[in-house]
């Protein structure tokens, strides 16, 4: 935490508005507490937070609204099928925003483009993105991209 106490004010000086933590073993009490301390410190420094990996949302973002979203979901980086995805709004999403990792054009997907387009709307996250493993250059000719832009 000592490094973050020095780093977070520096990030603000540089104009950075948020950080994404990742690859922390959140399952233990020790690391969950460490992560919550990080969110508090980010709030003190007016930084937004996005938690990566298997963190389980517990309502902490109600106290610290700078915690905009957290993964804690089997998103497209795991290439789930449509059956998995249609259960998420009724299971994982009841615990708050989810950083799902939409992979709109990835050829390994087991769903359609229409499914991905709908998922980006149904799966709530203030930091929604549409190209995780994709390249932005793939998107310039697709008419539905106007919907994402607006």
Regions found by a protein language model. Name each.
Residues 1-112:
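Aromatic- and carboxylate-enriched substrate-binding clefts and catalytic-loop regions
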Residues 134-150:
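Glycan-recognition and catalytic regions of carbohydrate-active enzymes
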Residues 100-139:
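Charge-patterned, long linear interaction tracts outside catalytic cores
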């Amino acid at each position: 935490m000592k490094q973050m106490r020095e780093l977070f004010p520096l990030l603000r000086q540089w104009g950075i508005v948020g950080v994404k933590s990742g690859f922390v073993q959140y399952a233990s009490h020790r690391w969950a507490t460490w992560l919550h301390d990080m969110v508090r410190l980010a709030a003190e420094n007016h930084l937004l937070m996005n938690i990566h990996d298997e963190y389980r949302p517990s309502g902490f973002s109600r106290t610290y609204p700078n915690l905009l979203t957290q993964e804690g979901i089997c998103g497209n980086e795991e290439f789930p099928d449509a059956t998995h995805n249609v259960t998420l709004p009724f299971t994982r999403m009841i615990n708050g925003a989810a950083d799902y990792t939409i992979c709109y054009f990835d050829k390994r997907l087991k769903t359609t483009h229409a499914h991905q387009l709908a998922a980006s709307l149904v799966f709530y996250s203030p930091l929604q993105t549409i190209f995780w493993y994709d390249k932005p250059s793939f998107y310039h000719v697709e008419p539905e991209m106007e919907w994402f832009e607006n």
